[in-house]
Amino acid sequence: MSLVLLPAVDVVNGEAVRLVQGEAGSETGYGSPRDAALAWQNDGAEWVHIVDLDAAFGRGSNRELLADVVGELDVQVELSGGIRDDASLEAALATGCGRVNLGTAAIENPEWCARAIAKYGEKIAVGLDVRLVDGEYQLRGRGWVTEGGNLWETLARLDKDGCSRYVVTDVSKDGTLTGPNLELLAQVCAATDAPVVASGGVSTIDDLRAIAGLVDRGVEGSIVGKALYAGRFTLPEALAAVSG
């Protein structure tokens, strides 16, 4: 089975941006989210990962714009950012996206998250945003600025709730082009039977090949952001490298 690549479109104030380590204020602008998403579709993407960073940081939202973008795309969309209650979840799903990615809600409101998983099943993925603190993997919430508790305890709880897939980000790697945390991915795969989507740190085609080497352990896909925008490689090159 080949690795699914999900090019990322992160949106701030109506513009496609990339952050460094998820820090507000570290944005580099890349123009229209619509143009970015359509470009990835034209380059052969089967999925696009779209993040409303304003909603993630709790400073507004780009919901109407993103609904328009999802509506224009023919490919599947994973929608993320600020989905923390019934209203934001239903609005996200109403865009017609393939699935949504819950982050902070899984940490701060486990009962609600469990209900969402029970109701929507495969439409719900949970983002596990991780940072190594004193030798232990800890989760981060609210745009990665709040403490979220122990990774393994949360993963066990979400597995029990029936979570269908996890998007695993090493926050220290994201937007840095320093390579993915393969050890973290392997450990998460060993701890759950649910498929895992990797995120953060991809800088070269070889990084993607290394992640593809974990497909037989449970890694299903990889989100790719800054490396594509920075021109390290093209999406067609990446897709060719990890197909089959």
Swiss-Prot record:
User: Biological process (GO) annotations?
Assistant: L-histidine biosynthetic process; L-tryptophan biosynthetic process
Q: Name one Pfam family in it.
A: His_biosynth
Can you cite an annotated GO cellular component?
A: cytoplasm
- EC number, as in UniProt: 5.3.1.16
Q: Does the keyword Cytoplasm apply?
A: yes
Localization per record: Cytoplasm
> Which Gene3D superfamilies does the UniProt entry name for this protein?
Aldolase class I (3.20.20.70)
Q: Which UniProt keywords apply?
A: Amino-acid biosynthesis, Cytoplasm, Histidine biosynthesis, Isomerase
Pathway it belongs to? Amino-acid biosynthesis; L-histidine biosynthesis; L-histidine from 5-phospho-alpha-D-ribose 1-diphosphate: step 4/9
Task: List where this protein forms a coiled coil.
Answer: none
Active-site positions on this chain: D10, D129
Q: Which reaction does it catalyse?
A: 1-(5-phospho-beta-D-ribosyl)-5-[(5-phospho-beta-D-ribosylamino)methylideneamino]imidazole-4-carboxamide = 5-[(5-phospho-1-deoxy-D-ribulos-1-ylimino)methylamino]-1-(5-phospho-beta-D-ribosyl)imidazole-4-carboxamide
Q: Which GO terms describe its molecular function?
A: 1-(5-phosphoribosyl)-5-[(5-phosphoribosylamino)methylideneamino]imidazole-4-carboxamide isomerase activity; phosphoribosylanthranilate isomerase activity
* Superkingdom to which the source organism belongs: Bacteria
Q: What is its main location?
A: cytoplasm
Q: Which NCBIfam families match?
A: hisA-trpF
Q: Give the family this protein belongs to, as stated in its UniProt record.
A: Belongs to the HisA/HisF family.
- This chain's protein is named 1-(5-phosphoribosyl)-5-[(5-phosphoribosylamino)methylideneamino] imidazole-4-carboxamide isomerase
List the gene name.
hisA
